[in-house]
Every structure is written in structure tokens, then in C-alpha cells.
């Protein structure tokens, strides 16, 4: 599980970024996936550091 450092709006979803071993990594989530995980897309864009990403499970976790 990795702490998200930033996020960016895409045409059909949001891409999140994190640092792993000094390298910037990313994973994208479409809006349907975000709704299914009960993630507020606007909150993810405005407060990305409140979230963690589990790349293996392709999930976002709120860490407020």
C-alpha cells in the first residue's frame, strides 16, 4: 500500500501518483471504479494525500 502524492483528472477517470524507491509510479481508475469503491472523485483530486493505493488489488483506501 502506497501513500498517494498527487492526482490528475483524465477524460474518463483519475490517475494517481506515488513514489516508490525514488521512482514516480501511477495507476489510473475510471469513474465507475471510483463509484464502486465509494471514492469521491472531487475529494481525490483536491486532497490526494488523504488516500492510499493498493496496486495489487487495484483499490484506493481513504486514510483521513
Predicted regions: what they are:
Residues 36-64:
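Mixed-charge, Lys/Arg-enriched low-complexity segments
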Amino acid at each position: 500500500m502506497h501513500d498517494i502524492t498527487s492526482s490528475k483528472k483524465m477524460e474518463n477517470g483519475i490517475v494517481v501518483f506515488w513514489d516508490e524507491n525514488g521512482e514516480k509510479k501511477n495507476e489510473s481508475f475510471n469513474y465507475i471504479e471510483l463509484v464502486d469503491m465509494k471514492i469521491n472523485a472531487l475529494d481525490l483530486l483536491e486532497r490526494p494525500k488523504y488516500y492510499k493505493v493498493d496496486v495489487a488489488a487495484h483499490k484506493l483506501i481513504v486514510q483521513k
